[in-house]
C-alpha cells in the first residue's frame, strides 16, 4: 500500500471513506484540517470519519523495515531523520495540494476553452445567418421606408452636381490622318440595338465604347472598341435558352450588362462571370426603346424610356422604380440619348420628332426641337461641351445650342456636297467638331472639321483616304476617338468593317 499523497508506504495507514483511498494518517489529517475535503474527490471530510487501518504484524514489520532502511541508508541521527521525514511529508502534502490546484485549474481552463470554441462556432453561424439575411435587407428596408420621387430626384440632382464639379472634360485632338488599315469584315445582328457606353478615364476624357453584337448558337458575341488599338471580343451565353434574342443591349457600371427581351423583360448580367444578377419586368404597356446606366452619376440606377415617352429609373439591386415622366399619346419614339450630366434625355424618331426631357423636373413639359420632317433623323448626340445637341440626318447636320431658347441653332444647318448623290454615310465625334464621311462611289473616307470662326464645316484636303475598290456598300457608320487613335466602323445590313486611321 502506498500513500496517495506522498507516494510512499504509510507508517500509519488510514482510509478515507469518501475516495476509499489509503493515506499516511498525519498527511490526511493535516489536509483535512486545512481544507475540510477529501484530497481525491474533494468531497467534505472530517477527521472523525477517517478510518485507521490496523496492519497485521507482518505488514507492520515490513513497513517499519522499509522506512527504517530508508532512513538508516540516508541518515545517521534518528531524531534528525525523523524531523527531516516530517518536513518531507509536509512538502509532499503541499506538493499534493499544488498538484490538485493545478489539475483543477487545468480542467477549468479546458472547460473555458471548450466554451470559447463553442461560442465562436455559434457566433460564426449567427454571422452567416446575418449575411444571408442582409441580402434581403435593402429590399425590405426600401419597402419599409419609402423614398419619395422628390427625394430620389434630389439625390439625382446632387450626384450630377458632384460630377460636374470635378472639372471640364477634355477631348483629344485629331491629327492629320494619312493612313488607314481595313480590318476583316465581321457579322453582327442589326436587329439588336446597342448604345455607346461612355467611361471617364484618368485624363478626364470620356472614352466612348461602341459595341456590335451577334446572337448565334445560343451565345452573344460582342465586338467593342474605344479607339483603333483597343478592340475586344467577348462571348457570353444567352441567358434565354429558349432562343429569344435581346432587342436592346446596353452596358452599365460595375461590369453590368443590360439585356432587354420581348415583353419589356430586362436581364442584368455580370459580364465578367456571366452570372445573371437580376430579372426585371418593367410595368409598361408600351415598348421600351432606350436604356442606359451612367457610370458616374446615380450609379445605383439605370434609366429606361418607352416609345410613348414614359421615363423611369430602375434600381440594379431591388424593385425600386421611379417614373419621372408619363407617356404621351401623340408621339412614337424610336431611340434616345442621355446627356453627360444625366439630367437631360432626348427622345426622337426618324420622322423629325425630337423632344428633350428635363429629368430633374418631372412636372415640366418636354421641349420640342424643330427638325424638318423630310430630314430623317439617324442619330442624336449631346456634345462633350455640354451645350450642343447634334442631330445627324440623312443629308444634313443640325446643331442646337442648349444655352439659348429652344430651337436656336449653334451654326447654320450644314449639307455636305457629296450628300446630293445619296451614297454617303457619315458620323460626328463626341466633341461635335470632327466628322468622317464615306462615299460608296469613290470608296473614300473624307475628314471634315468645324471652323469656329466661320461656324461652318470645312473639308480636310490632306486627309482623303481611299479603300480598296471591291469594298461593300456601307449604310451606316460610327466613329470612335481615344488615346489609341481614331477608328471608323463601317456597317452594312449584316456585317461591319473596322477602319483604323493613323497620321
Swiss-Prot record:
Further remarks about this protein from its record: Present with 11700 molecules/cell in log phase SD medium. The tetramer is an elongated particle consisting of four globular WD40 domains held together by a central stalk.
Protein name per the record: Pre-mRNA-processing factor 19
Family of this protein: Belongs to the WD repeat PRP19 family.
Membrane spanning residue stretches: none
Domain U-box residue range list: 1-71
Gene it is expressed from: PRP19
Organism expressing this protein natively: Saccharomyces cerevisiae (strain ATCC 204508 / S288c) (Baker's yeast)
CDD domains the record matches: RING-Ubox_PRP19 (cd16656)
Region (Interaction with CEF1): 76-134
Enzyme Commission designation: 2.3.2.27
Amino acid at each position: 500500500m502506498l500513500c496517495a499523497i506522498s507516494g510512499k508506504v504509510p507508517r500509519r495507514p488510514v482510509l478515507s471513506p469518501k475516495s476509499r483511498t489509503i493515506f499516511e494518517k498525519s498527511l490526511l489529517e493535516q489536509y483535512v484540517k486545512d481544507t475540510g475535503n477529501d484530497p481525491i474527490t474533494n468531497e467534505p471530510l472530517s477527521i472523525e470519519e477517517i478510518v485507521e487501518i490496523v496492519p497485521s504484524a507482518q505488514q507492520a514489520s515490513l513497513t517499519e523495515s522499509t522506512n527504517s532502511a530508508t532512513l538508516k541508508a540516508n541518515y545517521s541521527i534518528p531524531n534528525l531523520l525523523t524531523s527531516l521525514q516530517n518536513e518531507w511529508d509536509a512538502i509532499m502534502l503541499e506538493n499534493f495540494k499544488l498538484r490538485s490546484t493545478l489539475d483543477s485549474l487545468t480542467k477549468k481552463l479546458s472547460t473555458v476553452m471548450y466554451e470559447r470554441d463553442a461560442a465562436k462556432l455559434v457566433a460564426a453561424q449567427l454571422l452567416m445567418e446575418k449575411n444571408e439575411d442582409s441580402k434581403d435587407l435593402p429590399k425590405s428596408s426600401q419597402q419599409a421606408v419609402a423614398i419619395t420621387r422628390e427625394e430620389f430626384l434630389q439625390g439625382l440632382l446632387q450626384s450630377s452636381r458632384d460630377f460636374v464639379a470635378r472639372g471640364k472634360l477634355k477631348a483629344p485632338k485629331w491629327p492629320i490622318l494619312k493612313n488607314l488599315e481595313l480590318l476583316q469584315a465581321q457579322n453582327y445582328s442589326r436587329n439588336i440595338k446597342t448604345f455607346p457606353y461612355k467611361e471617364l478615364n484618368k485624363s478626364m476624357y470620356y472614352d466612348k465604347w461602341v459595341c456590335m453584337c451577334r446572337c448565334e448558337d445560343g451565345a452573344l458575341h460582342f465586338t467593342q472598341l474605344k479607339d483603333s488599338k483597343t478592340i475586344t471580343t467577348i462571348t457570353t451565353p444567352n441567358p434565354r435558352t429558349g432562343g429569344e434574342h435581346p432587342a436592346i443591349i446596353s452596358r452599365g457600371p460595375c461590369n453590368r450588362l443590360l439585356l432587354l427581351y420581348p415583353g419589356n423583360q430586362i436581364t442584368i448580367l455580370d459580364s465578367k462571370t456571366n452570372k445573371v444578377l437580376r430579372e426585371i419586368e418593367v410595368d409598361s404597356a408600351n415598348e421600351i426603346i432606350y436604356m442606359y446606366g451612367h457610370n458616374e452619376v446615380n450609379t445605383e440606377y439605370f434609366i429606361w424610356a418607352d416609345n410613348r415617352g414614359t421615363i423611369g429609373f430602375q434600381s440594379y439591386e431591388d424593385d425600386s422604380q421611379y417614373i419621372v415622366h408619363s407617356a404621351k399619346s401623340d408621339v412614337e419614339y424610336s431611340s434616345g440619348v442621355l446627356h453627360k450630366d444625366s439630367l437631360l434625355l432626348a427622345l426622337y424618331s426618324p420622322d423629325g420628332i425630337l423632344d428633350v426631357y428635363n429629368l430633374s423636373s418631372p412636372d415640366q413639359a418636354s421641349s420640342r426641337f424643330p427638325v424638318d420632317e423630310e430630314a430623317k433623323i439617324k442619330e442624336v448626340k449631346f456634345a462633350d461641351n455640354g451645350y450642343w445637341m447634334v442631330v445627324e440626318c440623312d443629308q444634313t447636320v443640325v446643331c442646337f445650342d442648349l444655352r439659348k431658347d429652344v430651337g436656336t441653332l449653334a451654326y447654320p444647318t450644314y449639307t455636305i456636297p457629296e450628300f446630293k448623290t445619296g451614297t454617303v454615310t457619315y458620323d460626328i465625334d463626341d466633341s461635335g467638331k470632327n466628322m468622317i464621311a464615306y462615299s460608296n462611289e469613290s470608296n473614300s473616307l473624307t475628314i471634315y472639321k468645324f471652323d469656329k470662326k466661320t461656324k461652318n464645316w470645312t473639308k480636310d484636303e490632306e486627309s482623303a483616304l481611299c479603300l480598296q475598290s471591291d469594298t461593300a456598300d456601307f449604310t451606316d457608320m460610327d466613329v470612335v476617338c481615344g488615346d489609341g487613335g481614331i477608328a471608323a466602323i463601317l456597317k452594312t445590313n449584316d456585317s461591319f468593317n473596322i477602319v483604323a486611321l493613323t497620321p
